[in-house]
Amino acid sequence: MTTTPSALKTSSLVLPTQVADGIWKKTVDGSVLARLAKRRPQKFGEVKQMTLTGTPRAELVGEGENKGPSEIGFGDKTVVPRKLQVTVRVTDEVRWADADYKLGVWDEIEDANAKALARALDLIGIHKINPLTGNVATTISEGVIDCDNTVTLAGGKYDEALESAIGLVLANGYAPDGIALDPMYSYSIAMMRDNDNRKLYPEMGFGQGEVSFNGLKGLTGTTVSGKPEIAAASNLLAIAGYWDAFRWGVQREIRAELIEYGDPDGLGDLKRKNQVAIRSEIVYGVGIMDLDAFALGDGAGIGDAGIGQVDVEEPADESDVRA
């Protein structure tokens, strides 16, 4: 059931005589795309990126021989501006409580808004969804999720599926330089063991944050699967890719704006309701140069085993045991 957002009230806060600095919050991971793909400077508006569609070849020329032509082709892809915003309301009483008790409410709201906008880059760039509703946005025509290179994760063979995804990127002529993983999928790989209970991938640690899979950089984040924002489960648990093919930049950014008048979000006049609003906005420029630079790990085939349920497989003989 959809609920109407309401303003933050002092009843939601703890106001003892002495309050420890800061407010505890659940850590929300940011954007995996922003960490894997290089941010590029952009001006506002659509940005045309030239792409090479034909690769010239060198010709061996003998003494006195004529030189032949080499073919080359160019195309273009468009980086499209995507505007996102977060608007939250608080009551006047919250402002007073924050001033008196030094709760750090304003800093916390600004930080939470920034994290929401960071996650939004992945949610539009990978899943093409409106983060607020969780539904696919009709205004976004292309996302990483549209990639046709897909490997189905089956049973407990999490590592083999990821290796296959990396192989698909290589087969398309790209050198994969990173992987994005759902945290529980990464954890499942990290917990894989041989029949002597030795970890197969000790470099994965517990599979959280920044990891390494056979020397390839990996980053974990819940935005890979789209949870919790996405309305319809995507089953996406891993992305292998050559990340220069995902182009993004920040065209305009408003860190935090205090709004004291009007009706900025359709919930009624602020002064009439004794409220203020805090709004954060950003305009991303987002474009994918070639979907073939990516491969997806689809968790639809995992079945009853489930992510996190790692079985230890007996090798055929001792030579099959990985140290």
Over which residues does each language-model region extend?
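Short amphipathic
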Residues: 85-90, 280
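Short conserved micro-motifs at the rims of enzyme active sites and ligand-binding pockets
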Residues: 60-62, 100, 190-194, 228-232, ...
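Alpha-helical scaffold segments that mediate packing/assembly in large oligomeric complexes
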Residues: 89-172, 296, 308-322
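Short loop/turn segments at secondary-structure transitions that flank enzyme active sites
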Residues: 55, 94, 119, 185-187, ...
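Extended oligomerization regions of viral-like shell subunits
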Residues: 151-269, 276, 282, 311-314, ...
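Protruding loop/beta-arch "assembly-hinge" segments enriched in small, turn-prone residues
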Residues: 1-28, 265-323
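Assembly/oligomerization interface modules of large self-assembling protein complexes
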Residues: 6-86, 293
